[in-house]
């Protein structure tokens, strides 16, 4: 019995029940079933409609799970809503990978609605099609119609990239065998192809490919590119066909899991043996022999194709066209298989048993290996569920027509609260008009972020980025989704090889489409003038953006093709700053092209040119070494991938990588770098924070950049206005629950203050914003909005250029104290500032083992002085448009050199360096939720490992900074010390006039005393405080000056108490006051004796009343007071911390009576 729409009403018969079933995608379906049907039969009845097998269904009604053996009537569910969820997978076995429903993709590919959907044209997406996925595994269908990724946040086992290469090769061998079988048995194929799409059961056979922390390449060729005149559905393969694999081919079609995938239980990588490689190569040879006769016929057809007349030979034309398509697809798969296997090597110098290893990751190659994959970083917060569903652009079979129109975008139904991106490109025009149901539907990739808020989902449609001449555009087919759902809009532009890209954001409340670009009409307009690279750039930009917003940004790897190493930037501290007032310099920018989850998945989105060959043509190399270093430090998203315009534009790709994959980042070096001739534009320019932060948290100057001149972005880049509108749309959607206004330019400081309810988080002198670096953080947070930061992350440095005057003024006032920015003054201020960090450096390295003979304190201080001197000189002197680019380069270079320097000083022990970093994080995060601190330290350890493995700074570059014990002091600080002494002569005479004590006592106490909190690192600010406080400083003894200054700064750190509270009235927190009660000596002897007797459990010999009267006698009480005073006097005399000058009235209370 077919289900009807939830809005429909059906006449209920006495022996029937109307049951409403609501699934997790918020769709409600109505079923009319017999009253005597039991729950198991009901599950089987609805399985086809909900695309969930009956054995995996769990029906819940009023908090109870319906039992299979009971009847529906017993639960009284008539007319009620039952919730349907999927049963959790078994945790003790490998996934079977063969449980997809029959309707998961048929609506998408056929264009006709299935019964039970909520509107015509809506597609039925099985959220968990192709079964579940265990830790670190992907279930991939045999035809590429859907890919669902469920990522378990637990630690994934270590597996082998060579093993994945073999699995990929075996999958492609299986596909080649299927194509050969179709060519050899044409009859069955024709019968299959003659069925119309809506009636074709979409039975998806899954394969399980184990991808783990060593995997760097995506499983490709599950959705191969389409020929514009392909008459048949290439990937539609019956699951009953058994591939003719060799005995080593452990990837049979159907539910059997892929054999070579190692079990997730193992902790060591299961590398394949060379014998397995040989077996796969032998199978390839057999396939080549089978393909040879068809290849000869293929050559004959192509040789005569230019002049052959098919006017009266429709059957011959279809046969030849079919042969061309199938042989061409076979050649593509065969070539990809050889490419996948060509990087497998065996090192004969190793001791047996030897295994295979990979010399070049798949990301090294451009589009032939990773074509038609959307650039989606999978970002996961702890506890989130991420589902990536990729629906390949698959032309459905048609009875006699060879028409597939890749230009039309299929309207797709999305769940509520979805962030939708439709990026569809046009292909070649079809030979004739084709009906909308025969259109080629775009690849759909969804990423759900489930948290307390409703699901935030990113939905991106990307079709073939084939650079073909613009064809006749076709309108979207069918209505744009049912009410209440996000709409997927795909507009085509005649004459453009790439269609414009649309970003539509919808919230759970009344959804409204939000066009992402300001230049065109609101919804139906077309983006003009964004350049040929818009599709790729926007796909990558939105991918990285949504990923960063859903989680912590972590790493980037880029470089020129000639470089051997790639840059990897560690995690930024922006999120920690937003959640706790930490004294970091700025909400550090994070990369857009690579991001990682909580120790599970590291996803990099890349784009490169799409030439016909398998290798990327080398772009022009910069001539200068500093230019190469600039490029190495970062190229994120400025312009699109290819350096030259024209049809050969980049294709969005997806590369699935895991933390700690050396080959991945090395391949990214070659793969990411397109034509660049100028230093990259930067993100925010925070100077280095205090030393421990410089070594620990890499916030100061995260990777970023683009391929643009310092004056602006290149002609192929996205306009800043367009970029801003996209960012505002996504931010408004994701931050709407926090009260953010749409299109708001609210600063980060105002945003955090509004959320925290406190008005002094970023005010000068408030908690977490003291000292030079705290004031710098306050400046950046007050001037940067969320949109500005995200734009900076993606290489649009306009916000940074806008902040240049404020930064220069800030450095002039807070750094130089109003003096002229001469080299001597800058050196003096740098020395004063960095010297104040000595206690922090000493504290940070107090618990780790430093390399023998190395003076770690001097090494860090002198290194930071040199680096910060360059940064400050640049900020104070640079006035041209290259301000931001050079500043970013200085910050990045200083950061990497700092990490490399300290790693060298710690004897190359990464664990020691991680201990320094995590210790600093814990000290900075006092009072923060311990689980958050633990997560931060864990994430930092993972990121640090990746960064250190691919450090772009070699040991030779930092040896000049190493200081040994006994080395002569550096001569540079002498001048600052002299100037510093001259500067301080002004307040000293006043103090000498006010007190006979030496005038240097206060300065000595200040230099020897512990610096107050992170803010105390700024000694020039302390000097300023002394100068500003001259009136009271002259009126008190000089030794009181540092004590009063410390008290002032300590009082500023204390958060204000609510007015007129108990704590306010009593002068101390209520909890502390309660714990203090009863402590200290009792002034009444009777009370003291009573408490002592009670504590000891003693009982008086006489009555308590008689004892009390005796103790209250005046002479006894006076003797007690004298004894108490004597004890206190003795305690004060023996206390080294007691000073009569600090407590001038103490003698009145405790001295003998006059």
UniProtKB/Swiss-Prot annotation:
Residues 237-658 are annotated as: 4 X 29 AA approximate repeats. One of its GO terms (cellular component) is nucleus. It comes from Mus musculus. Keywords: Acetylation, Apoptosis, Chaperone, Chromatin regulator, Cytoplasm, Differentiation, Immunity, Nucleus, Phosphoprotein, Repeat, Secreted, Spermatogenesis, Transport. The ubiquitin-like domain mediates interaction with the E3 ubiquitin-protein ligase RNF126 which is responsible for the BAG6-dependent ubiquitination of client proteins. SGTA also binds this domain and competes with RNF126 to antagonize client protein ubiquitination and degradation. The ubiquitin-like domain also mediates the interaction with USP13. Residues 96-112, 400-409, 568-581, 591-609, 1029-1042, 1088-1098 have a biased composition (Low complexity). Disruption phenotype: Lethality associated with pronounced developmental defects in the lung, kidney and brain. Lethality is either embryonic consecutive to abnormal brain development or perinatal associated with pronounced developmental defects in the lung and kidney. These developmental defects were associated with widespread aberrant apoptosis and proliferation. Lethality can be partially rescued in an ICR genetic background: mice are slightly smaller in size than their wild-type counterparts and show impaired genotoxic stress responses. This is Large proline-rich protein BAG6. The gene is Bag6. Signal peptide: none annotated.
């Amino acid at each position: 019995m077919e289900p009807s729409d939830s809005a429909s009403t059906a006449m209920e018969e006495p022996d029937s029940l109307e049951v409403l079933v609501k699934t997790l995608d918020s769709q409600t379906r109505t079923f009319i079933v017999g009253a005597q049907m039991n729950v198991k039969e009901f599950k089987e009845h609805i399985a086809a409609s909900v695309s969930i097998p009956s054995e995996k269904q769990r029906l819940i009604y009023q908090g109870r799970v319906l039992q299979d053996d009971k009847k529906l009537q017993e639960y009284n569910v008539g007319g009620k809503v039952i919730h349907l969820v999927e049963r959790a997978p078994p945790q003790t076995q490998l996934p079977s990978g063969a449980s997809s429903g029959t309707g998961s993709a048929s609506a998408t590919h056929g264009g006709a609605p299935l019964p039970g959907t909520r509107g015509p044209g809506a597609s039925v997406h099985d959220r968990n099609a192709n079964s579940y996925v265990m830790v670190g595994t992907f279930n991939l269908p045999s035809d590429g119609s859907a890919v669902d990724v469920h990522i378990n946040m637990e630690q994934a086992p270590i597996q082998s990239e060579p093993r994945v290469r073999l699995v990929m090769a075996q999958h492609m061998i299986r596909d080649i065998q299927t194509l050969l079988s179709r060519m050899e048995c044409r009859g069955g194929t024709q019968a299959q192809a003659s069925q119309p799409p809506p009636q074709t059961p979409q039975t998806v056979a899954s394969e399980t490919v184990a991808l783990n922390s060593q995997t760097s390449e995506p499983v490709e060729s599950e959705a191969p590119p389409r020929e514009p005149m392909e008459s048949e559905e290439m990937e539609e393969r019956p699951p009953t066909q058994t591939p003719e694999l060799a005995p080593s081919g452990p990837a049979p079609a159907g539910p059997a899991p892929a054999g070579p995938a190692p079990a997730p239980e193992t902790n060591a990588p299961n590398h394949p043996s060379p014998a397995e490689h040989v077996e796969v190569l032998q199978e390839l040879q057999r396939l080549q022999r089978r393909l040879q006769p068809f290849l000869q016929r293929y050559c004959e057809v192509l040789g005569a194709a230019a002049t052959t007349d098919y006017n009266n030979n429709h059957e011959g034309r279809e046969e030849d066209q079919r042969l061309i398509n199938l042989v061409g697809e076979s050649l593509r798969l065969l070539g990809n298989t050889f490419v996948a296997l060509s990087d497998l090597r065996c090192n004969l110098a190793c001791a047996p048993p030897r295994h295979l290893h990979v010399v070049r990751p798949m990301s090294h190659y451009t589009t032939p290996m990773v074509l038609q994959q959307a650039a989606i970083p999978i970002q996961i917060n702890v506890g989130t569920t991420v589902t990536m569903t990729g629906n390949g652009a698959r032309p459905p079979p048609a009875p006699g027509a060879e028409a597939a129109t890749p230009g039309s975008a299929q309207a797709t139904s999305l769940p509520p609260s979805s962030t939708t991106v439709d990026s569809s490109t046009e292909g070649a025009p079809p030979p004739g008009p084709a009906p909308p149901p025969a259109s080629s539907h775009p690849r759909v990739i969804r990423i759900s972020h489930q948290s307390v808020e409703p699901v935030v989902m990113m939905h991106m449609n990307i079709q073939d980025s084939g650079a073909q001449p613009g064809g006749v555009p076709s309108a979207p087919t069918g209505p744009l989704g049912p009410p209440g759902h996000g709409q997927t809009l795909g507009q085509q532009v005649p004459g453009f090889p790439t269609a414009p890209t649309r970003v539509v954001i919808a919230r759970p409340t009344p959804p409204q489409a939000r066009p992402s670009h300001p230049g065109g009409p609101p919804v139906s307009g077309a983006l003009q003038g964004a350049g040929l690279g818009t599709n790729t750039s926007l796909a990558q930009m939105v991918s990285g953006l949504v990923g960063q917003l859903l989680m912590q940004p972590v790493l980037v790897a880029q470089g020129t093709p000639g470089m051997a190493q790639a840059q990897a930037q560690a995690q930024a501290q922006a999120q920690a700053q937003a959640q706790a007032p930490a004294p970091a310099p700025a909400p550090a920018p994070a990369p857009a092209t690579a991001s990682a989850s909580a120790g599970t998945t590291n996803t990099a989105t890349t784009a490169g040119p799409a030439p016909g060959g398998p290798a990327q043509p080398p772009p022009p190399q910069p001539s200068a070494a500093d230019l190469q270093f600039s490029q190495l430090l970062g190229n994120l998203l400025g312009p699109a991938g290819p350096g030259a315009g024209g049809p050969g534009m980049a294709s969005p790709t997806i590369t699935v990588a895991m933390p700690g994959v050396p080959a991945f980042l090395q391949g990214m070096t070659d793969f990411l770098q397109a034509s660049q001739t100028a230093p990259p534009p930067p993100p925010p320019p925070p100077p280095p924070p205090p030393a421990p932060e410089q070594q620990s948290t890499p916030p100061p100057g995260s990777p970023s950049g683009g391929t643009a001149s310092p004056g602006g972005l290149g002609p192929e880049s996205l306009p800043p206005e367009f970029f801003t509108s996209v960012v505002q749309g996504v931010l408004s959607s994701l931050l709407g629950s926090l009260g953010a206004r749409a299109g708001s330019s609210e600063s980060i400081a105002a945003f955090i203050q509004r959320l925290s309810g406190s008005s002094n988080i970023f005010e000068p002198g408030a908690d977490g914003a003291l000292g030079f670096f705290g004031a710098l953080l306050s400046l950046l947070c007050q001037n940067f909005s969320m949109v500005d930061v995200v734009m900076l992350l993606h290489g649009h440095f306009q916000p940074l250029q806008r902040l240049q005057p404020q930064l220069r003024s800030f450095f002039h006032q807070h750094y130089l104290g109003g003096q002229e920015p001469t080299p001597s003054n800058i050196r003096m201020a740098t020395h004063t500032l960095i010297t104040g960090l000595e206690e922090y450096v000493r504290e940070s390295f107090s618990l780790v083992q430093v390399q023998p003979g190395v003076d770690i304190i001097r090494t860090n201080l002198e290194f930071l002085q040199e680096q910060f001197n360059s940064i400050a000189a640049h900020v104070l002197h640079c006035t041209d448009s290259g301000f931001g680019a050079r500043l970013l380069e200085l910050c990045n270079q200083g950061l990497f050199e700092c990490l490399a320097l300290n790693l060298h000083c710690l004897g190359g022990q990464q664990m020691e360096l991680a201990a320094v970093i995590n210790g600093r994080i814990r000290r900075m995060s006092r009072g923060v939720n311990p689980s958050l601190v633990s997560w931060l330290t864990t994430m930092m350890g993972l990121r640090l490992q990746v960064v250190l493995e691919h450090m772009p700074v070699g040991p030779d570059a930092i040896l000049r900074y190493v200081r040994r014990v006994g080395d002569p002091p550096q001569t540079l600080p002498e001048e600052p010390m002299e100037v510093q002494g001259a500067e301080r002569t002004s307040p000293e005479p006043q103090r000498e006039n006010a007190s006979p004590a030496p005038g240097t006592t206060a300065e000595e106490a200040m230099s020897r005393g512990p610096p107050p909190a992170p803010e105390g690192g700024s000694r020039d600010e302390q000097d300023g405080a002394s100068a500003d406080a001259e009136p009271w400083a002259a009126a008190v003894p000089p030794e009181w000056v540092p004590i009063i200054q410390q008290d002032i700064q300590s009082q500023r750190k204390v958060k204000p108490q609510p007015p007129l509270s108990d704590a306010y009235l009593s002068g101390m927190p209520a909890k502390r006051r309660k714990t203090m009660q009863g402590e200290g000596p009792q002034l009444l002897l009777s009370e003291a004796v009573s408490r002592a007797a009670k504590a000891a459990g003693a009982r008086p010999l006489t009555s308590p009343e008689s004892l009390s009267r005796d103790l209250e006698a005046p002479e006894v009480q006076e003797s007690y007071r004298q004894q108490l005073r004597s004890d206190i006097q003795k305690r004060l005399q023996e206390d080294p911390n007691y000073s009569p000058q600090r407590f001038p009235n103490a003698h009145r209370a405790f001295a003998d009576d006059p």
